[in-house]
Swiss-Prot record:
GO terms for cellular component: extracellular region. The catalytic maturation of ScpA appears to reside outside the cascade of activation started by the metalloprotease aureolysin (aur). It comes from Staphylococcus aureus (strain Mu50 / ATCC 700699). Cysteine protease that plays an important role in the inhibition of host innate immune response. Cleaves host elastins found in connective tissues, pulmonary surfactant protein A in the lungs, and the chemokine receptor CXCR2 on leukocytes. Proteolytic cleavage of surfactant protein A impairs bacterial phagocytosis by neutrophils while CXCR2 degradation blocks neutrophil activation and chemotaxis. Additionally, promotes vascular leakage by activating the plasma kallikerin/kinin system, resulting in hypotension. Cleavage leads to the activation of ScpA probably by an auto-catalytic manner. It catalyses: Broad endopeptidase action on proteins including elastin, but rather limited hydrolysis of small-molecule substrates. Assays are conveniently made with hemoglobin, casein or Z-Phe-Arg-NHMec as substrate. The gene is sspP. This is Staphopain A. Keywords: Hydrolase, Protease, Secreted, Signal, Thiol protease, Virulence, Zymogen. GO terms for molecular function: cysteine-type peptidase activity. Prematurely activated/folded staphopain A is inhibited by staphostatin A (ScpB), which is probably required to protect staphylococcal cytoplasmic proteins from degradation by ScpA.
Length: 388
């Protein structure tokens, strides 16, 4: 289960964030006066279907609120920014549509990702699926009022500014300083210049929406002690990170670490053979058994009710995913952890997932077995190991 990014993915946009009053805003007695403003977001926006916009507008606040409650945040108000796309170096979009979610301070807290249904693999009956996570929010907040291109490869995420210099803004924990110096100066070729699209100011939602009602109505169920203690670097240890996070949560401890788990299971591997090794489901079950658990393999995605019951009983679930885009090479398979589940105020059932690559959680439609991840790929949730 090794991680593999496409060589480079580019996000081309101009981000200009400012809070300004708007005329003719709808009145809402539940929203404070300072919330009746909007944030202008400059993005590259082409051919976004009306259905996508409507879905984002209708459901974003419910999904955002579920994560707020998972993070134990207070009630807040948000507005939905205009959509942008992520482009690969062949200048084609990755197929998803992204919407920034802005707070009343003008900062991005979350990114809404809307993906067209992948008919061959998806169990969802909907034309589009919606997921919410922090994703690139911190990176975008660092580059207000600048035209940037964001690139990513196996070493992390780069921002290329208007002076064509690349800066590594999200590095992998295992990246050595020597390698870091070499990668900071790339890429600077014509491909980067050509990917910079001209953009104009676009209007986000006309007013902020308070999540007060949504917050009170939602049902949230979470592994009580689940925390993100470490994230996956330039290695193939996704299963190690997943099991460590689950066991730390269910035992309420900090003693499990991915590298130690991998060393326990593969004691004779050295160098890159160790760095890029993965685990089989059998090895994952065996490790759980050595730690006093009785993990069970389920050859499908867990249902919402199963997640609800297992989480209530303090039993962790590992997601086993198969990459839709390519079944070959590094990270054709990937492991993730189930944090919990939520029933939104609109009745939608979602599963909360942690991808070891990320510093935050993401929402997943409980009826959709295809998970979009932060590098633009999609993983089919084909099996589960529960009982950690």
């Amino acid at each position: 289960m090794k991680r593999n990014f496409p060589k480079l993915i580019a996000l081309s946009l101009i981000f200009s964030l400012s809070v300004t009053p708007i005329a003719n805003a709808e009145s809402n007695s539940n929203i404070k006066a300072k919330d009746k403003k909007h944030v202008q977001v400059n993005v590259e926006d082409k051919s976004v279907p009306t259905d996508v916009r409507n879905l984002a507008q209708k459901d974003y606040l419910s999904y955002v609120t579920s994560l707020d409650k998972i993070y134990n945040k207070e009630k807040a108000s948000y507005t939905l920014g205009e959509p942008f796309k992520i482009y690969k170096f062949n200048k084609k979009s990755d197929g998803n549509y992204y919407f920034p979610v802005l707070n009343t301070e003008g900062n991005i807290d979350y990114i809404v990702t809307i993906s067209p249904k992948i008919t061959k693999y998806s169990s969802s009956s909907s034309k589009y699926t919606i997921n919410v996570s922090p994703f690139l929010s911190k990176v975008l907040n660092q580059y207000k009022d600048q035209q940037i291109t964001i690139l990513t490869n196996s070493k992390g995420y780069y921002v290329v500014t208007q002076n064509h210099k690349a800066k590594l803004v999200l590095k992998t924990p295992r990246l050595e300083d020597k390698k870091l110096k070499k990668t900071e100066s790339i890429p600077t070729g014509n491909n980067v210049t050509q990917l910079k699209q001209k953009a104009s100011v676009t209007m986000p939602t006309s007013q902020f929406k308070s999540n007060n009602y949504t917050y009170n109505e939602q049902y949230i169920n979470k592994l009580e002690n689940f925390k993100i203690r470490e994230t996956q670097g330039n290695n193939g240890w996704c299963a190690g990170y997943t099991m460590s996070a689950l066991l730390n949560a269910t035992y309420n401890t900090n003693k499990y670490h991915a590298e130690a788990v991998m060393r326990f299971l593969h004691p004779n591997l050295q160098g890159q053979r160790f760095q890029f090794t993965g685990l089989t489901p059998r090895e994952m079950i065996y490790f759980g058994q050595t730690q006093g658990r009785s993990p069970q393999l389920l050859n499908r995605m867990t249902t919402y009710n199963e997640v609800d019951n297992l989480t209530k009983n303090n039993k962790g679930i590992a997601v086993l995913g198969s990459r839709v885009e390519s079944r070959n090479g590094m990270h054709a398979g990937h492991a993730m952890a189930v944090v919990g589940n939520a029933k939104l105020d609109n009745g939608q059932e979602v599963i909360i997932i942690w991808n070891p690559w990320d510093n935050g959680f993401m929402t997943q439609d409980a009826k959709n077995n295809v998970i979009p991840v932060s590098n633009g790929d999609h993983y089919r949730w084909y099996s589960s190991i529960y009982g950690y």
